[in-house]
């Protein structure tokens, strides 16, 4: 009985002590080592309490928006994969002011919006850009914008399924990636278009693309005004001035070839060349500097080589001789390559050594871009470039298969 009474007294004492000392049983008779252990326990519990408060604060800041449609992203990917621009425009109109998270740059969101709602963007700017950048071939469509301090940057998709970024200040169209799926997976990563002071998301910090409403993001302080949003981001404009200077040379060269590109048949090409024999058309290419126009009769071709050329025509297609390709290394006309154009619009040169026709481009326009492939690679100039006077738009030879296929798609 005495033992039970003692145990009950000890229990009451333990409970009382626990209540008054944060569940640490402190008695009046403790050693120095036990005090150290108790202080260590108190320190651990304090850390746990602080961590719990910090976690609650993080959870309070976390965005929990309601996704407009569980299959919305898959639906948009399907439209972009099929390059159905009309459905993409309808999708953007339906989910206007909803945002899609991007893995890079950090805290960057693609906001679905219409052209009239983009700051500093006018309908005329879009039409001029679409026309100058061969919109009649690519036909660009606005997906939305990403925000960089003091500006909205439009993100566009073309009929080729490729994604582009339009820098409004320099009026430069930058190639981002080959399709929308790559854009969702990688963002603007590795394109050298946007520089970022912050590191890329690590594997565990990005939970995949998700939709959030613009209002919800602002209420949770995730998105602020464009003046203070993504202050660490900026557009990389190194080399833009150089590209602009080269573009002037490129446009000037296209102007010289514009009349030739508008020829609608081989007879028209032959007539144009015969009226301009000896005229030099400038070429900005790594090897060839100009094209001297000349007919099959005026261009020096031996009887044997002429027969070989005719044999090649039977094997490939009928061609019309345009003239000589000139360079300082070629001292005599006998060694200069002869440039030809085929009935399909393809460009060939006649190889003197192997006596064969070698294709240089699918059309005159792609041939003229050869010298600019390195400079304009990031801008997608292998298939899309800024041109003037609607180069070869009305020609069956100048644009050939590319133009005709795109016209059939646009109907």
Curated annotation (Swiss-Prot):
InterPro entries in the cross-refs: US22-like
Top-rank taxon: Viruses
Protein name: Protein U8
């Amino acid at each position: 009985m005495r033992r039970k009474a003692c145990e009950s007294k000890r229990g009451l004492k333990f409970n009382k002590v626990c209540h008054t000392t944060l569940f640490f049983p402190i008695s009046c008779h403790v050693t120095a080592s036990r005090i150290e252990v108790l202080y260590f326990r108190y320190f651990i519990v304090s850390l746990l309490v602080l961590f719990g408060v910090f976690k609650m604060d993080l959870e309070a800041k976390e965005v929990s928006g309601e996704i407009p449609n569980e299959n919305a992203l898959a639906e948009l990917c399907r439209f972009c994969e099929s390059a159905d621009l009309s459905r993409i425009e309808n999708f953007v109109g339906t989910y206007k002011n909803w945002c899609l998270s991007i893995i890079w740059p950090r805290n960057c969101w693609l906001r679905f919006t219409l052209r009239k709602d983009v700051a500093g963007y006018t309908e005329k700017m879009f039409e001029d850009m679409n026309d100058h950048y061969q919109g009649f071939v690519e036909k660009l469509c606005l997906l939305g914008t990403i925000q960089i301090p003091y500006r909205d940057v439009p993100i566009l998709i073309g009929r080729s399924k490729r994604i582009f970024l339009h820098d409004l200040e320099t009026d430069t169209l930058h190639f981002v990636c080959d399709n929308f799926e790559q854009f969702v997976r990688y963002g603007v990563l590795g394109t050298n278009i946007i520089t970022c002071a912050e590191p890329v998301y690590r594997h565990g910090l990005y939970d995949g693309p998700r939709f959030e409403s613009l209002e919800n993001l602002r209420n949770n302080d995730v998105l602020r005004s464009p003046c203070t949003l993504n202050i660490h981001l900026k557009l990389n404009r190194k080399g833009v001035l150089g590209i602009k200077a080269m573009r002037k040379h490129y446009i000037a060269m296209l102007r010289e070839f514009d009349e030739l590109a508008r020829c609608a048949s081989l007879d028209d090409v032959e007539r144009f060349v015969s009226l301009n024999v000896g005229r030099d058309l400038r070429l900005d290419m790594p090897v060839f500097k100009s094209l001297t126009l000349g007919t099959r009769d005026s261009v020096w071709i031996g009887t044997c080589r002429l027969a070989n050329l005719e044999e090649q025509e039977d094997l490939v297609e009928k061609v019309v001789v345009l003239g000589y390709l000139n360079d300082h290394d070629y001292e005599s006309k006998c060694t200069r390559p002869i440039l030809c154009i085929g009935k399909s619009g393809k460009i060939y040169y006649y190889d003197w050594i192997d006596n064969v026709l070698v294709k240089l481009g699918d059309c005159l326009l792609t041939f003229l871009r050869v010298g600019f492939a390195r400079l304009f690679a990031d801008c997608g100039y292998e298939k899309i470039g800024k041109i003037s006077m609607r180069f070869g738009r009305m020609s069956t030879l100048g644009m050939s298969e590319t133009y005709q296929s795109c016209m059939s798609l646009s109907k």
